[in-house]
């Protein structure tokens, strides 16, 4: 004879606010040549309520920026074709894109890198490896200022 055991599992219930979001928190263009990092950033920002587009490098970013019209660009420093520094310079030189907030994502946030970014007009830095929540908060603040 087989005996069945009954058991109960209790788990806390977490209520989420599922109200329809009529307008995104802002538009973000995520620029990174590493597909995994690019998608990680994009998905986290989408879950937070941002409208997200992606680009594979600086050249792709410059080609997409007029169409996407982002409030914030997350920009990796080390990329092929056109790196993050040159991309940021070109964004700042163009009157049509100079207002866009730029977050540099870099493994190299040494003092001279930060100084260079400040000279270019970079708005914020996030150092790799990064906490997605830190990046989200940074983007939230910049998007709020941008709108």
Q: Predicted regions: what is each one?
A:
Residues 68-74:
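Active-site beta3 strand of CheY-like receiver
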């Amino acid at each position: 004879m087989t005996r069945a055991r009954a058991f109960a599992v209790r788990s806390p219930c977490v209520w989420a606010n599922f109200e329809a979001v009529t307008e995104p928190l802002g538009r973000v263009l995520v620029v990174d040549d590493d597909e995994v990092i690019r998608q990680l950033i994009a998905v986290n920002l989408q879950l937070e309520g941002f409208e997200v587009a992606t680009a594979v490098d600086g050249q792709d970013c410059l080609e997409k920026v007029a169409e996407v019209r982002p409030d914030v660009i997350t920009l990796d420093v080390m990329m092929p074709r056109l790196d993050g520094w040159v991309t940021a310079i070109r964004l700042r030189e163009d009157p049509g894109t100079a207002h866009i907030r730029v977050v540099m994502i870099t493994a190299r946030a040494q003092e001279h890198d930060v100084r260079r970014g400040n000279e270019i007009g970079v708005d914020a830095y996030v150092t790799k490896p990064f906490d997605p929540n830190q990046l989200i908060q940074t983007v939230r603040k910049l998007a709020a200022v941008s709108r």
